[in-house]
From Swiss-Prot:
This is Eukaryotic translation initiation factor 3 subunit B. Residues 1-147 are annotated as: Disordered. Phosphorylated. Phosphorylation is enhanced upon serum stimulation. The modification N-acetylmethionine is found at M1. One of its GO terms (cellular component) is cytoplasmic stress granule. Residues 44-56, 135-147 have a biased composition (Acidic residues). Residues 113-402 are annotated as: Sufficient for interaction with EIF3E. GO terms for molecular function: RNA binding; translation initiation factor activity; translation initiation factor binding. The modification Phosphoserine is found at residues 37, 40, 68, 75, 79, 84, 88, 90, 111, 120, 123, 141, 143, 153, 228.
Length: 803
């Protein structure tokens, strides 16, 4: 064997064999290790490529080594067959004996190779000198030994190639049947054909059509044949349910579906009962006795993630894991799930032990979004997708884990690409001159068509109803406009025309009671930009609009979540001011208060309203102002140097400021404050990255019940005050608890001692001759009388002199 492998082949033989080989001549044979277990996977890939190039005859085999040189020279043995595909592609045979030896090593049959070398044609060592003398070399043989059994199927070996193999088709795969087509006569048939062709040619080239007729009219159904079965499938997917007019809605099916539906068994098979997977109480944290909230913390530059209970003194750790996520985490809108990011997809966790609830495979996922109802999850990956299988954006069903639909993503899009309605029944996306609105659970277009809106720039859903707002810029003499549309009827309930518009921003109040359109304008005859706040009162008839104009630069705008006030930061540093406005019931917008010389660039309202934090983040060194808007007083002014984030807890009782390692590499920590601006905690975490409060679902109490609780608040306040006194300090709380435990232990011991004392009473009576010494007056002789005298001094003081 070794001699056969070391024999060199003349250059002339290599040059003649070169056209027949597909491997480059510069490649060297692999070692035994590479030809053995390590070369199988590579060999499969390379041979699959060679099979694709070899043509439609994958069963052609190499001629046996026993053939003559003439037969070998004329045989098509250049390309390896699928049966010998396990041979490493880097092997370049230099002689028949060597080719057989290396080939047998790659297949893992060394004994068979030895038999081939010692066959009837002589050994490889004898064959090669004869070839050298004649100046020629035999072509290599790739044939298998007689006792070789190939137990690898073509599907396992060349599955990626065979899936693209042409398949036989009888032509009906490209035919669709369209029902509910208008029945027309010959005079209108041509017009109907034009309409049908216009609708269905969007999905592919139509090569044939057939309109059955009866009594001089069409029968109401037609047959269309596409150039490709894929086009037919696309037509069924998108045109089924297409509404032609009020009386005709198309029903589209593949022609091959008739066989499928006609062969359905009449016997009903009872489906197997799926075992119920108990996930536990996914909202357990809402039953916490002290009504504490939870929050997640990522630190050590993302290597560790922890979940804490929020406690006034010190946070209480619930769960901590290493490498729980690869980037960041996100809570679902109602706090049921915690989403973690991984290279291969998204995982959802929940329950008291934070077990994995669901996972979604999406390679390279970077962004996600939940529907407000927590029924659907949207994932985005920047990896390239194909026209036939869009994978950039995928919508998943959270309960089942199934993929609902995939979408393409334009490079210029901004996240979130899909925006959800308040109840999760609709979601929409904006493309060039188009607003596409989809409905759940079908994930199809509403009414099977998109809205054509020329020049649409932005849109936003109302948080309190299925109303969508969008704006369109000016086009020559046509003014810009803001439109409010009711869905699913698509009725325009309000249109507002605007002039000299530069830009618009849409701001909804949390309950959907108001919409503010921030309009940047350049009025004629003036220099600079003027900002108008167009306030739409959504709960009133015909949606009246009020306007507030400001000529200063606008830094930030924010609505009070549960109220009718809004705040505006305006001006330029160092003269930045904040103004608070109130929208009255009569429509008048009143300026409540304006604070000058503020170091702030962001507004953070409490989730319950009334209280607001004005923060100067990042470049403004973390200046903080805590304001009570009920009387517009500044409760406290503080600073968290280089603060990058501010997060209110869901109840509005606490607020967290933090310095993230993602934005600033030193002094990474998060501080806990009360809503009044009193600092409670300073929590320093190594390379702290992110803190997120766990959201709470909407309350189940009615407005009347909430009013009653507020009315009886004094009754509950005594209990709360007592708890507050006990928890004023950690030391006092521990001391009281220790004393309470000692007192309870003493009471139990005293009770046990009294019971034992009473059990021993009869024994005491016997020992004392029947005298009950338990009573003090049981023996009068034992009494001793003692008299105690107290000396009293009497002093008389006259009240006045006697005359």
């Amino acid at each position: 064997m070794q001699d056969a492998e070391n024999v060199a082949v003349p250059e002339a033989a290599e040059e003649r064999a070169e056209p027949a080989r597909q491997q480059p001549a510069s490649e060297s044979p692999p070692t035994d290790e590479a030809a053995g277990s390590g070369g199988s996977e590579v060999g499969q890939t390379e041979d699959a490529e060679e099979d694709a190039e070899a043509g439609p005859e994958p069963e052609v085999r190499a001629k046996p080594a026993a053939q003559s040189e003439e037969e070998t020279a004329t045989s098509p043995a250049a390309s390896p067959t699928p049966q010998s595909a396990e041979r490493s592609p880097s092997q370049e045979p230099s002689a028949p004996g060597k080719a057989e030896a290396v080939g047998e090593q790659a297949r893992g049959h060394p004994s068979a190779g030895a038999e081939e070398e010692g066959g009837s044609d002589g050994s490889a060592a004898e064959a090669e000198p004869r070839a050298l003398e004649n100046g020629e070399a035999d072509e290599p043989s790739f044939s298998d030994p007689e006792d070789f059994v190939d137990d690898v199927s073509e599907e396992e070996l060349l599955g990626d190639v065979l899936k693209d193999r042409p398949q036989e088709a009888d032509g009906i795969d490209s035919v669709i049947v369209v029902d509910n087509v208008p029945q027309v006569g010959p005079d209108r048939l041509e017009k109907l054909k034009n309409v049908i062709h216009k609708i269905f040619s969007k999905f592919g080239k139509i090569i044939n059509d057939y309109y059955p007729e009866e009594d001089g009219k069409t029968k109401g159904y037609i047959f269309l044949e596409y150039a490709s079965p894929a086009h037919a499938v696309d037509a069924v997917k998108n045109a089924d349910g297409y509404k032609l007019d009020k009386q005709h809605t198309f029903r589209v099916n593949l022609f091959t579906d008739f066989d499928k539906y006609m062969t359905i068994s009449d016997e009903w098979d009872i489906p197997e009962k799926q075992p119920f997977k108990d996930l536990g109480n996914l909202r357990y944290w809402l039953e916490e006795a002290e009504c504490r909230d939870q929050y997640s913390v990522i630190f050590e530059s993302g290597d560790r993630t922890s979940i804490f209970w929020n406690d006034v003194k010190d946070p209480v750790s619930i769960e901590e894991r290493a490498r729980w996520t690869e980037t960041y985490v996100r809570w679902s809108p109602k706090g049921t799930y915690l989403a973690t990011f991984h290279q291969r997809g998204i995982a959802l966790w929940g329950g008291d032990k934070f077990k994995q609830i669901q996972r979604f495979s999406h390679q390279g996922v970077q962004l996600i979004d939940f529907s407000p109802c927590e029924r659907y999850l949207v994932t985005f990956s920047p990896l390239m997708d194909t026209q036939d299988d869009p994978q950039a954006i995928i919508i998943w069903d959270i309960l089942t884990g199934h993929k609902k639909r995939g979408f393409h993503c334009e490079s210029s899009a901004h996240w979130p690409i899909f925006k959800w309605s308040h109840d999760g029944k609709f979601f929409a996306r904006m493309t060039l001159d188009t607003l596409s609105i989809y409905e759940t659970p079908s994930m199809g277009l509403l009414d099977k068509k998109s809205l054509k809106i020329s020049g649409i720039k932005d849109f936003s859903w109302s948080p309190g109803g299925n109303i969508i707002a969008f704006w369109v810029p000016e086009d020559k003499d046509i003014p810009a406009r803001v439109t409010l549309m009711q869905l699913p009827t698509r009725q325009e309930i309000r249109v507002r025309n605007l002039f000299n518009v530069v830009d618009c921003k849409l701001h909804w109040q949390k309950n959907g009671d108001y919409l503010c359109v921030k309009v940047d304008r350049t009025p004629k005859g003036t220099q600079g930009v003027v900002t108008n706040f167009e306030i739409f009162r959504m709960r009133e008839k015909q949606v009246p609009v009020d306007v507030v104009e400001m000529k200063e630069t606008i830094i930030a705008f924010a609505w009070e979540p549960n109220g009718s006030k809004f705040a505006v930061l305006h001006g330029e540093a160092p003269r930045i001011s904040v103004s608070f406005y109130h929208v009255k019931s009569n429509g008048k917008i009143e300026l409540i208060k304006m604070f000058d010389k503020q170091q702030a660039n962001t507004i953070f309202w409490s989730p319950q309203g009334q209280f607001v934090v004005l923060a100067g983040l990042r470049s403004m060194n973390g200046a903080l102002a805590f304001v009570d808007t009920s009387d517009c007083t500044v409760m406290n002014i503080a600073e968290h140097y280089m603060a990058s984030d501010v997060e209110w807890d869901p109840t509005g009782r606490y607020v967290v400021t933090s310095v993230s390692w993602w934005s600033h590499k030193v002094d990474n920590a998060y501080w806990l404050w009360t809503f009044q601006g009193r600092l409670l905690q300073k929590n320093n975490k190594d390379r702290f990255c992110q803190l997120l409060w766990r959201p709470r679902p909407p309350t189940l109490l009615s407005q009347d019940q909430i009013k009653q609780i507020k009315k009886d608040l004094k009754k509950y306040s005594k209990i709360f005050e007592q708890k507050d006194r006990l928890s004023q300090s950690k030391a006092s709380k521990e001391l009281v608890e220790r004393r309470r435990t000692m007192m309870e232990d003493f009471r139990q011991y005293r009770k046990m001692a009294q019971e034992l004392y009473m059990k021993q009473k009869n024994e005491r009576l016997e020992l004392r001759g029947g005298v009950d010494t338990d009573e003090l007056d049981s023996n009068v002789d034992d009494w001793e009388e003692e008299t105690i005298e107290f000396f009293v001094t009497e002093e008389v003081i006259p009240l006045g002199s006697q005359e």
